Amino acid sequence: MLKLFSAFRKNKIWDFNGGIHPPEMKTQSNGTPLRQVPLAQRFVIPLKQHIGAEGELCVSVGDKVLRGQPLTRGHGKMLPVHAPTSGTVTAIAPHSTAHPSALAELSVIIDADGEDCWIPRDGWADYRTRSREELIERIHQFGVAGLGGAGFPTGVKLQGGGDKIETLIINAAECEPYITADDRLMQDCAAQVVEGIRILAHILQPREILIGIEDNKPQAISMLRAVLADSNDISLRVIPTKYPSGGAKQLTYILTGKQVPHGGRSSDIGVLMQNVGTAYAVKRAVIDGEPITERVVTLTGEAIARPGNVWARLGTPVRHLLNDAGFCPSADQMVIMGGPLMGFTLPWLDVPVVKITNCLLAPSANELGEPQEEQSCIRCSACADACPADLLPQQLYWFSKGQQHDKATTHNIADCIECGACAWVCPSNIPLVQYFRQEKAEIAAIRQEEKRAAEAKARFEARQARLEREKAARLERHKSAAVQPAAKDKDAIAAALARVKEKQAQATQPIVIKAGERPDNSAIIAAREARKAQARAKQAELQQTNDAATVADPRKTAVEAAIARAKARKLEQQQANAEPEEQVDPRKAAVEAAIARAKARKLEQQQANAEPEEQVDPRKAAVEAAIARAKARKLEQQQSNAEPEEQVDPRKAAVEAAIARAKARKLEQQQANAEPEEQVDPRKAAVEAAIARAKARKLEQQQTNAEPEEQVDPRKAAVAAAIARAQAKKAAQQKVVNED
């Protein structure tokens, strides 16, 4: 009896609220075995066939590809896609995909070469020796995703389960009408499906493994029981046929009695669910080394002559599959991808088959009935009775229609599985699922916008905080700079404090006066001399500053000096190269001396008439002195080369000596009348004084060497002496005036 009760508890199933029993319409396609479809000429492979971001392209236009070759790289939740056959990549461009609005997504377009060559396949028959991480990575890189309709990456799902999974559920319910892809797969490939289940169990290490299958699939149930006859680790649970018992939350409750919490996942209660087709794809990826390049697709509907289930390559155009099955379209033919309750109508037939495509339904005009007009809600609550998620579809309809997003969220519209049971039972023919889909899309867009706004606000606040910190740091630096004195100020303050302390120390010392001693004023005298030296140093700095603004162009002065030196050298060379027999004409020499004296007198008159404010450029004066010296040397050489019989005129010599002395005195007066700030080069002055003294001595020697017979005219000598005395007196007076 206890064993009976234990077996009853072990095989117990639960029932969920709501649900409907629509016509199954499965016998149209589940009676024929799986078959292959001829290769299409062109394949369109969308890069995104799963939940998550698209992968990174690793092929380019013109590349040759083989079947199973990766077209994208998968990182994180990015699942790679693979070439369904061998051929050439002819384009990488947006193309309409399996979507209610046929939205264009980036796709790789391949022209098949007809050879259908595989890449080298490396199967892991000994997968039990592989680590959990290696198996998960292989499943992910081989592109395996949930084939039941969600399209969630299987590797990511297994990784997220971790060690907290106690129950592994294999969903074999396939509850929606018309769809028989999983049914036919279990009938034809039951052993491979079970092998894939064992691989998943090896990765997750669950406490129990449950296969949930509806009782309307007797052939599949028989095949699974035959394969599991010798297995005690996998339990096959047959459940009543009820739509939507194949939903993840509903099947979890049916088999375990546990409910997935609101906003949570099945892994939160220790349950992980995989589809039958996913288990088969895992087996082919791990053991056979084949990426997912094809899947089972149901072709059904009264508009198809040969309904059944086929192996459809991913990327095959829908039109190609339907034509192979004998598609006979009517005038207003409808083609539905998926089932009649959860599927969507295709806007055109050139969309490709993707990983989540499980059925192509082409009903006739009478099969689904005439479309009926939407009417007003009568509040019959039939939708609430049929809802398997225990929601209030009537209220959600009003909130969705009135754009009341907050109230729709409060009434848990996110828990709607969009099964269509409410729309099926609605007597007013209201397309409730369409309203709910639109409302959830709008809420998702609003949340996305709020997320972006929050991120922008966070960035703005971070920027403001950074600017405030920088501003506070600048103010602190300014305050510190204002409080702390500079290095120069510190030195001045220290010197002032030292002087104050010295004065205080001197004030505290007693003054002792001794009789007969003189006061020692050496310190005072030294301080006075120091102040005078400091004043002279400042005056010299000011004079240098003023000289920098008033000096003549140094380049012009240098050029003039260079020209004078060149002329002097030229004259010296000419005189040195002259023949010794050639004699200098004394008359020409006398004329040149007279011209020089006239120029000197003219220069003296111009300088005497000049304004006293005008300053004499010492460099120009030096250049003129150099020119005068050169001319004097020339005259001296000419006189030395003259005939020895010719005697020097003592009167001319006296006049020239007087002129030289007058020029020397005038130069001294000009230097004395210059501004006190202007400094005369002492070396130049010494050179000029030495030259003047040399000229004077030379003239005196010439006078002493003159003939004694020749007498000087006393009147001319008296006149010259009077002129010299007058000039000396005038120079003395001018000097006194300048000193005052």
UniProtKB/Swiss-Prot annotation:
<feature type="binding site">
    <location>
        <position position="416"/>
    </location>
    <ligand>
        <name>[4Fe-4S] cluster 2</name>
    </ligand>
</feature>
<keyword id="KW-1278">Translocase</keyword>
<dbReference type="GO" id="GO:0009055">
    <property type="term" value="F:electron transfer activity"/>
</dbReference>
<feature type="binding site">
    <location>
        <position position="426"/>
    </location>
    <ligand>
        <name>[4Fe-4S] cluster 1</name>
    </ligand>
</feature>
<dbReference type="Pfam" id="PF13375">
    <property type="entry name" value="RnfC_N"/>
</dbReference>
<feature type="binding site">
    <location>
        <position position="422"/>
    </location>
    <ligand>
        <name>[4Fe-4S] cluster 2</name>
    </ligand>
</feature>
<feature type="domain" description="4Fe-4S ferredoxin-type 1">
    <location>
        <begin position="369"/>
        <end position="397"/>
    </location>
</feature>
<protein>
    <recommendedName>
        <fullName>Ion-translocating oxidoreductase complex subunit C</fullName>
        <ecNumber>7.-.-.-</ecNumber>
    </recommendedName>
</protein>
<keyword id="KW-0249">Electron transport</keyword>
<dbReference type="InterPro" id="IPR026902">
    <property type="entry name" value="RnfC_N"/>
</dbReference>
<keyword id="KW-1003">Cell membrane</keyword>
<dbReference type="InterPro" id="IPR037225">
    <property type="entry name" value="Nuo51_FMN-bd_sf"/>
</dbReference>
<keyword id="KW-0472">Membrane</keyword>
<comment type="similarity">
    <text>Belongs to the 4Fe4S bacterial-type ferredoxin family. RnfC subfamily.</text>
</comment>
<dbReference type="InterPro" id="IPR017896">
    <property type="entry name" value="4Fe4S_Fe-S-bd"/>
</dbReference>
<dbReference type="GO" id="GO:0022900">
    <property type="term" value="P:electron transport chain"/>
</dbReference>
<dbReference type="InterPro" id="IPR019554">
    <property type="entry name" value="Soluble_ligand-bd"/>
</dbReference>
<keyword id="KW-0479">Metal-binding</keyword>
<keyword id="KW-0813">Transport</keyword>
<dbReference type="GO" id="GO:0046872">
    <property type="term" value="F:metal ion binding"/>
</dbReference>
<feature type="region of interest" description="Disordered">
    <location>
        <begin position="602"/>
        <end position="716"/>
    </location>
</feature>
<dbReference type="Pfam" id="PF12838">
    <property type="entry name" value="Fer4_7"/>
</dbReference>
<keyword id="KW-0004">4Fe-4S</keyword>
<feature type="binding site">
    <location>
        <position position="387"/>
    </location>
    <ligand>
        <name>[4Fe-4S] cluster 2</name>
    </ligand>
</feature>
<dbReference type="InterPro" id="IPR017900">
    <property type="entry name" value="4Fe4S_Fe_S_CS"/>
</dbReference>
<keyword id="KW-0997">Cell inner membrane</keyword>
<keyword id="KW-0411">Iron-sulfur</keyword>
<feature type="binding site">
    <location>
        <position position="419"/>
    </location>
    <ligand>
        <name>[4Fe-4S] cluster 2</name>
    </ligand>
</feature>
<keyword id="KW-0408">Iron</keyword>
<feature type="binding site">
    <location>
        <position position="383"/>
    </location>
    <ligand>
        <name>[4Fe-4S] cluster 1</name>
    </ligand>
</feature>
<feature type="binding site">
    <location>
        <position position="380"/>
    </location>
    <ligand>
        <name>[4Fe-4S] cluster 1</name>
    </ligand>
</feature>
<dbReference type="Pfam" id="PF01512">
    <property type="entry name" value="Complex1_51K"/>
</dbReference>
<comment type="subunit">
    <text>The complex is composed of six subunits: RsxA, RsxB, RsxC, RsxD, RsxE and RsxG.</text>
</comment>
<comment type="function">
    <text>Part of a membrane-bound complex that couples electron transfer with translocation of ions across the membrane. Required to maintain the reduced state of SoxR.</text>
</comment>
<dbReference type="Pfam" id="PF10531">
    <property type="entry name" value="SLBB"/>
</dbReference>
<dbReference type="InterPro" id="IPR011538">
    <property type="entry name" value="Nuo51_FMN-bd"/>
</dbReference>
<dbReference type="InterPro" id="IPR010208">
    <property type="entry name" value="Ion_transpt_RnfC/RsxC"/>
</dbReference>
<feature type="binding site">
    <location>
        <position position="377"/>
    </location>
    <ligand>
        <name>[4Fe-4S] cluster 1</name>
    </ligand>
</feature>
<dbReference type="GO" id="GO:0051539">
    <property type="term" value="F:4 iron, 4 sulfur cluster binding"/>
</dbReference>
<feature type="domain" description="4Fe-4S ferredoxin-type 2">
    <location>
        <begin position="407"/>
        <end position="436"/>
    </location>
</feature>
<keyword id="KW-0677">Repeat</keyword>
<dbReference type="GO" id="GO:0005886">
    <property type="term" value="C:plasma membrane"/>
</dbReference>
